[in-house]
């Protein structure tokens, strides 16, 4: 059992009514009067829906035991993403709504890890950094480095990130998948 005050982003837990929830954001909140509460943004792992809720810090939940296996992203068709276990060659179908954030960072044939809760496939874990190519960005302007604000760039997966002014279309970039931000040129 884990207390609500110990839940952090990325953790998965089971509620008293059997829902499997993943924490997207968690913060302590102390109102002017009354007790501290934990405000959380959660995703129902099975349905893919996200919602905001509050818990008392002392509320207890069962922490979900999540196992991972190495896999490869094959392709997406309609509302389903297809993955293959690289050890057993078993294929898994995952609804896109459950992995839409992760799909922003991976291309076909990318290595990932499939997450299981018991025998149920619940999601995909991508590497902390990936290399993606810039498909579209504004041209560089001489002397524009003084502001340092950067410019938006569209990557080959459709993800838009803010990049420095010297980045041009066609360049490969290292992207942080946790924050969805530019790290460096590859």
UniProtKB/Swiss-Prot annotation:
Compartments it resides in:
Cytoplasm
Report the Gene3D superfamilies cross-referenced here: 2.30.30.30, Nucleic acid-binding proteins
The cross-references to HAMAP family, in alphabetical order and at most eight, read: EF_P
Pathway(s) of this molecule = Protein biosynthesis; polypeptide chain elongation
Species, as recorded: Streptococcus thermophilus (strain ATCC BAA-491 / LMD-9)
This protein is called what? Elongation factor P
Please give the chief subcellular localization of this protein. Answer: cytoplasm
Q: Which PROSITE patterns match?
A: EFP
What does the entry give for GO biological process? peptide biosynthetic process
NCBIfam families the UniProt entry points to: efp, PRK00529.1
GO CC annotation terms, alphabetical: cytoplasm
């Amino acid at each position: 059992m884990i207390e609500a005050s110990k839940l952090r982003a990325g953790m998965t837990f089971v509620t008293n009514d059997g829902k499997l929830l993943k924490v997207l954001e968690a913060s302590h909140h102390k109102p002017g009067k009354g007790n501290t509460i934990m405000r959380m943004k959660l995703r129902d792992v099975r349905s893919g829906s996200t919602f905001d809720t509050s818990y008392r810090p002392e509320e207890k939940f069962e922490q979900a035991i999540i196992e991972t296996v190495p896999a490869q992203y094959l392709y997406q068709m309609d509302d389903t993403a297809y993955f293959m276990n690289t050890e057993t060659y078993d294929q898994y179908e995952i609804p896109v709504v459950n992995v839409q954030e992760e799909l922003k960072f991976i291309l076909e044939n990318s290595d990932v890890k499939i997450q299981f809760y018991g025998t149920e496939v619940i999601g995909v874990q991508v590497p902390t950094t990936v290399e993606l190519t810039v498909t579209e960005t504004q041209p560089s302007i001489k002397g524009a480095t003084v502001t340092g604000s950067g410019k938006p760039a569209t990557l080959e997966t459709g993800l838009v990130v803010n990049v420095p002014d010297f980045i041009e279309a066609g360049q490969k970039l290292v992207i942080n998948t946790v924050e969805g931000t530019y790290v460096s040129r590859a």
